[in-house]
Amino acid sequence: MSIFVTGDIHASYDIAKLSESCFDTAGLTKDDYVIICGDFGLVWNNSASEQYWLRWLDTRPFTTLFVDGNHEGFSLLDSLPETTWNGGAVHQVATSVFHLKRGQLFNIDGYQIFTMGGASSSEYDRTHRTQGKTWFTEEIPNEQERAAALETLDAADWDCDFVITHCAPSSNAQGISEHTDRLKIHPMDEYTDWLQTIQDRLTYRHWFCGHYHIDAQIQDKTTALYNRIAVLADPKTIADTDDEETLSLPYQLLPEPAGTQKSPIPDYVSQIDDQDSLEIDLD
């Protein structure tokens, strides 16, 4: 069993990193997991395109997990069946595709993984999108969700192995700015300040986020992902080692694919009228 973590896929726009040409899945099964750090983007309106890509993920030899970002269809997402999976609440999106709800702690392959989705859309998005259709106030966790997250962490004595969010806590601003100017679009805000209170108090091995469209370690124990895929160290290795390097960086980045990552869209799907049922501004 292996656990992989990667960044935003934005529906089909950036899903190519999970294709066979970019991601060697030899030997993987549905007992292996790929966690997407938000902006999953395949739950908006049940379009033919969305249904195709969800079926495509179901055919891949891994189980797909994701936290929500700010580019999600929250009306549909929140209406999906909720169940308990590996100790936490999830929405089941497809046979082997699960939304890891906010403020949950999952036991996956012996690792305790805390999830807290959500992020603020850019001013451009809030101005040019339609609230309740292509932009949702639910993108920011509400007070009840935050209270539930604190209760989850209280029950775990504020100790876990990994944290998965979409945006980063505010103290990561400098590290992000060294790699991108996207903070001009997505500045730190009240929610990232709240995440900072979590990071300051929590004992954890490593924190992963998406949102900023970079692949970089932005703080000693925080990594932002976009195109690259990280594989978590085997928990038995972590438990048995006293190697400081392994303990300080408990994951490895898979080799970067050569060439352009192009979405593996077959001809008949590319002809579907609503293939691009939502214009996503990646700038």
Predicted regions and their residues:
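Beta-strand-turn-beta hairpins that frame and shape the catalytic cleft
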Residues: 1-4, 104-115, 162, 219-223
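Core catalytic region of metal-dependent phosphoesterases/phosphodiesterases
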Residues: 6, 12-107, 184, 188, ...
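Short, solvent-exposed loop/turn segments at secondary-structure junctions
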Residues: 10-11, 41-42, 71-73, 118-122, ...
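A short acidic (Asp/Glu
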Residues: 15-16, 45-48, 76-79, 167, ...
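Conserved beta-sheet core of the metallophosphoesterase superfamily
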Residues: 63-67, 83-87, 91, 95, ...
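Active-site-proximal loop/helix segment associated with metal-binding centers of metalloenzymes
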Residues: 95, 109-187
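A short C-terminal boundary segment appended to hydrolase-like catalytic domains
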Residues: 246-283
